[in-house]
Amino acid sequence: MACTGPSLSGAFDILGAAGQDKLLYLKHKLKTLRPGCRGAYLLHAMVLLKLGQETEARISLEALKADAVAQLVARQWAGVDSTETPEEPPDLSWAVARVYHLLTEEKLCPATMREEAYRAALRAFRSRDDLQLGELQEEARDRCGWDVLGDLGGVQTLRSDLGCLPPSSASLSRTRSDPRPIEHLSGWSTACSLRSTGSPASLGSNLEISQSPTMALLSVHHSHHGPSKLCDHPQASVVPEPAPMGCQEPEEMSWPPSVEAADSPVRPSSPGPGLPEVTTDACPASPHDPPEVPEISAHYPVECTDVPAAPKSLPSPSKNTCLVTDQTPVQLSEEDTAYLSAQPRPPTPSVPQTSPSFPSASTSPFPSPSTPPEAHPTPSKAHPTPPKAHSTPPKAHPTSPKAHPTSPKAHPTVWNPEPPPPELESSEQKFYNFVVLHASADEHIALRVRERLEALGVHDGATFCEDFQVPGRGELHCLQDALDHSAFIILLLTSNFDCRLSQHQTNQSLMSSLTRHGWQDCVIPFLPLESSLAQLSPSTSSLLTGLVLLDEHSKIFARKVTNTFKPQMLRARKAKWRKEQDARALREQSQQLESERQHAAAWGAAYSAYVHSYLAYQTQVEKLQVALANYMPFGTQLPFGGQGSLGTPPSSFPTLPGHQPPPLPPWLGGTPPPIFPQPPQTFPQPPPTFPQPPPTFQQPPPACPQPLDFSQAPPARPQSPGLQPLIIHHAQMVQLGVNNHMWNQRGTQAPEDNTRETE
């Protein structure tokens, strides 16, 4: 049964009730946490003690010599002999709180026990005025929320007391009362920033005045301890906020839309002191001008914290580098990936999010103004700047100079840095210090051997079944990966290590050690406790006769392990492995570039052939034009004459006597033909491709049907460059037909023809 109060014994009771599977999961998880998460190593040692692995627990506690709490655990629970009397360390309560925090994250205890542990630590540190109280308060606030600091004995309710300072004679006007130093600090609460009850929404503004003397405001530690002080001179970015006027519920305090709220009358029944008045200017302040301090009249002093002159974004609320605060899932080592994949991983608990400094319209408890802030910009006088939470201001995001200093868009609602670009998941295999090759029936022995070697100081080990034997992949490919990505190959010699696959693994391992440069003596035959030399087959024994066995039965087994797996040799082989991987990547990249180069060369050759054929075609067309010009009648202009370039449409067409030149059809002039045939609006004209009669032709007699004479011909469309004229010589009659209409024209017989007939 777990203890009711937060203590180390209570944490041990919680671990005892968790179960064997959960403790094994915690063992592998806590071992891989980064050093920034304090309390993980202590809890890891406690888990080892609960699992009965006292030797490993003592090794872990021995590594924490500087931790007094770890030494206390070693003396009381690990059975470490010590002549000194166990004394309770001063930071025991803090260490217990961190342990309970990790237990809460693993769903082993409720969050109320973690809060109680942090409250006990805060009370202990506050009672002796410890210098680390500020850091403890920040950690408790980040992990347990704001309320964990509200019910401590040393923190009082912040109120406006009329007896501390003489009331100001100034009324609600544009004048500002002179600041006076606070002489007696006993009647005042601890110097802290102010916020509304139950919501940290006032973090964006450093000051918030209570609505009435009867409403308690929780004081939250937001700066280092020290006497409260009034600002001697107005800071460029420190501006008090106006108090809500004439109502019990607070109004929008970050950006008031106008000055009407400041001029509203005060309720007569309100017993509170005089309220300040915020004055605004007619024109907004320039972004380059520093904001001024508003002229207010107050009956009580308020605390001002030092802030930088330039407006900055809210800093990060936490300095803790623990994994929980970073809100990133715990990444386990490669050696425990396969083990943890088989175990049901508990869901990642939710982490308290930092509340926005300026609440949005949908979530803010304050009523939104009827007029948007863009329509009525407020001068920088009445706008408060977010305070500095720590003594050293963190790096803030640059503010655009075009943004107005009083516009809500110029201030981020949450200090949310730009997320880094997503890193591409690397397909590179991890390098292991050793890999255990075993038969399929010896998986449990291989896992035990790996844990034994890791406990002796040889970290980053692997087993063939756990890290390389991927389902769906070839067995030989998995074996080659194990040989390529490990410093030592351990052959687990048992009675089952006698099949053909095991013999093949042995042969491949020996050949790799002989042919791979720098990997000599990398094959280690391992004789576990579950086996003996008599159980080995003759073929295996004869094959490994020339190698020295690593016998787990030996009394100097630990020393042999230390001499075999030397850190210098492991680092050297990892460096060589890294060079091999880089060389392999360069070879693959060069092969890809060569393939792309050949592809580009093929495209270039194809394009060159196309250009060559096009130029040959163009030359042939020009020759045909020159030959065609020799057969044209004198005075007839070629559509593709020597004056124009290739593809230039003709300037004019020869026309029939008494007729207008015909227009091109729409589909020849660049316009697509209609979907449905359209009836002709006018009588069709002969296309320009038909030959024109020579000038010697006469008009036909009146008896012959003549084509209609159109008074207004449609405008000529752009001529197609592909049309060629048809030339007819020595014809007495020419008949033309277009769209089911035909007409003809007769001419006089040529003189040479008459001569021939006479003869």
UniProtKB/Swiss-Prot annotation:
Region feature Disordered, mapped onto this chain: 241-296, 340-426, 642-723
InterPro entries membership: RHIM (IPR025735), TCAM1/2 (IPR046946), TICAM1 (IPR017278), TIR_dom (IPR000157), Toll_tir_struct_dom_sf (IPR035897), TRIF_N (IPR040886)
Positions with biased composition (Pro residues): 366-376, 659-705
Residue ranges, annotated region (TRIF-NTD): 1-153
Record cross-link Glycyl lysine isopeptide (Lys-Gly) (interchain with G-Cter in ubiquitin), residues: K229
Chain spans, region Sufficient to induce apoptosis: 549-759
Motif (TRAF6-binding): 84-91, 248-255, 299-309
Residues in TIR domain copies: 430-590
Molecular function terms from GO: signaling adaptor activity
Keyword hit for Ubl conjugation: yes
Modified residues (Phosphoserine): S210
Low complexity composition bias: residue spans: 351-365
Residue numbers covered by motif pLxIS motif: 207-210
Compartment list: Cytoplasmic vesicle, Autophagosome; Cytoplasm, Cytosol; Mitochondrion
Free-text description of this protein's post-translational modifications in UniProt: Phosphorylated by TBK1. Following activation, phosphorylated by TBK1 at Ser-210 in the pLxIS motif. The phosphorylated pLxIS motif constitutes an IRF3-binding motif, leading to recruitment of the transcription factor IRF3 to induce type-I interferons and other cytokines.
UniProt KW Ubl conjugation keyword: yes
Superkingdom, natural source: Eukaryota
GO biological process, one term: defense response to virus
Keywords annotated in UniProt: Antiviral defense, Apoptosis, Cytoplasm, Cytoplasmic vesicle, Immunity, Inflammatory response, Innate immunity, Isopeptide bond, Mitochondrion, Phosphoprotein, Ubl conjugation
Cellular component GO terms, alphabetical: autophagosome; cytosol; endosome; mitochondrion
Subunit-structure text: Homodimer. Found in a multi-helicase-TICAM1 complex at least composed of DHX36, DDX1, DDX21 and TICAM1; this complex exists in resting cells with or without poly(I:C) RNA ligand stimulation. Interacts (via TIR domain) with DDX21 (via C-terminus). Interacts (via TIR domain) with DHX36 (via C-terminus). Interacts with AZI2 and IRF7. Interacts with TICAM2 in TLR4 recruitment. Interaction with PIAS4 inhibits the TICAM1-induced NF-kappa-B, IRF and IFNB1 activation. Interacts with IKBKB and IKBKE. Interaction with SARM1 blocks TICAM1-dependent transcription factor activation. Interacts with TRAF3.
Domain-related comment: The pLxIS motif constitutes an IRF3-binding motif: following phosphorylation by TBK1, the phosphorylated pLxIS motif of TICAM1 recruits IRF3. IRF3 is then phosphorylated and activated by TBK1 to induce type-I interferons and other cytokines.
Functional description taken from the UniProt entry: Involved in innate immunity against invading pathogens. Adapter used by TLR3, TLR4 (through TICAM2) and TLR5 to mediate NF-kappa-B and interferon-regulatory factor (IRF) activation, and to induce apoptosis. Ligand binding to these receptors results in TRIF recruitment through its TIR domain. Distinct protein-interaction motifs allow recruitment of the effector proteins TBK1, TRAF6 and RIPK1, which in turn, lead to the activation of transcription factors IRF3 and IRF7, NF-kappa-B and FADD respectively.
Protein name per UniProt: TIR domain-containing adapter molecule 1
The species this protein was found in: Bos taurus
Lineage, opening ranks: Eukaryota, Metazoa, Chordata, Craniata, Vertebrata
Protein's gene: TICAM1
